[in-house]
Amino acid sequence: MSIARRTTLSKFLIEQQRETNNLPADLRLLIEVVARACKAISYNVSKGALGEALGTAGSENVQGEVQKKLDILSNEILLDANEWGGNLAAMASEEMETFFPIPANYPRGEYLLVFDPLDGSSNIDVNVSIGTIFSVLRCPDGKQATEESFLQPGTEQVAAGYAVYGPQTVFVLTTGNGVNCFTLDREVGSWVLTQSNMQIPADTREYAINASNARHWYEPVQRYVDELNAGKDGPRGDNFNMRWIASMVADVHRILNRGGIFMYPADKRTPDRPGKLRLMYEANPMSFIVEQAGGAATTGTQRIMEVQPTGLHQRVPVFLGSKNEVERVTSYHAEGEGK
């Protein structure tokens, strides 16, 4: 592809705005600001130990998880980049206990931005792919946001995406009209369209789950994974491979490109806590992307994007990816009426 004919993210969004009339100018500008923030995060991630940002920060987030220095830095980059643009009423982050209203000295917009600033941060110090996940909602109360303003089901998302900071830095986006992938051209500093209308194969021979938790799984998950592991000699009559990176953005990006199912189920260790992944910051945006690419996403008992949130940091079980596999494991939950 010649440099002159490359489609940048800005050009792509402007063309979408003209062609579909469902991408308002303020939403387009918001997406561009988020993408610029992801470039800044990518730069800091790539510096590694040279940037003195590796290691823990000596603090915990609202989830009770030890924060990495890059967790805090990435959160600050996203807040600073988006607070003054006039497109947002408020923001919410996995790293903050409560939401962040746009300061009174800045103009306010009609959107809400929800994000996990650095997903997979346990991998930071060992140089494994990590990323940023985000979701955009309309503020139902106009420009005056409350915590309740954020508590909308995933079906209300107007945009969602993620960036992966790996061998290449990529930015994957949906605004409800398919899924497209942009790669960061570091020489010119632009996001360039490299994959259009991405589609997840309906069938797969790969699955992603943390198998070290197998003894804690509920029966539907145990049954499903046992069938996969039985290979050609089992009821599936085919061999399956397990892939687990412990970085949701990296695992989902692989599935988006070549198929597979990602599973993070609830388990018996914490029966009062339905899963580990956050509905607002991880499950909803990834489900929007996966469904737009022809896949499926459920909690095992219902479509993730139809879950009515009850809190900013609500957790849910997650099964997403190739449609036929997600439907199979979901049917096992229905048969067993289990988690």
Swiss-Prot record:
Name where it's found: Cytoplasm
Keywords linked to the UniProt accession: Carbohydrate metabolism, Cytoplasm, Hydrolase, Magnesium, Metal-binding
Q: Which cofactor does it need?
A: Mg(2+)
Which amino acids does the record list as binding Mg(2+) 1? E94, D116, L118
List the Gene Ontology MF annotations in alphabetical order.
Answer: fructose 1,6-bisphosphate 1-phosphatase activity; magnesium ion binding
- Per UniProt, substrate binds at D119, G120, S121, S122, N210, K276
Where Mg(2+) 2 is bound, by residue?
D116, D119, E282
Cite a GO CC annotation: cytosol
Report the Pfam families cross-referenced here.
Answer: FBPase (PF00316), FBPase_C (PF18913)
Catalyzed chemical reaction(s): beta-D-fructose 1,6-bisphosphate + H2O = beta-D-fructose 6-phosphate + phosphate
Which Enzyme Commission numbers does its entry carry? 3.1.3.11
Q: Which HAMAP family match?
A: FBPase_class1 (MF_01855)
Q: What is this protein called?
A: Fructose-1,6-bisphosphatase class 1
By which gene is this protein encoded?
Answer: fbp
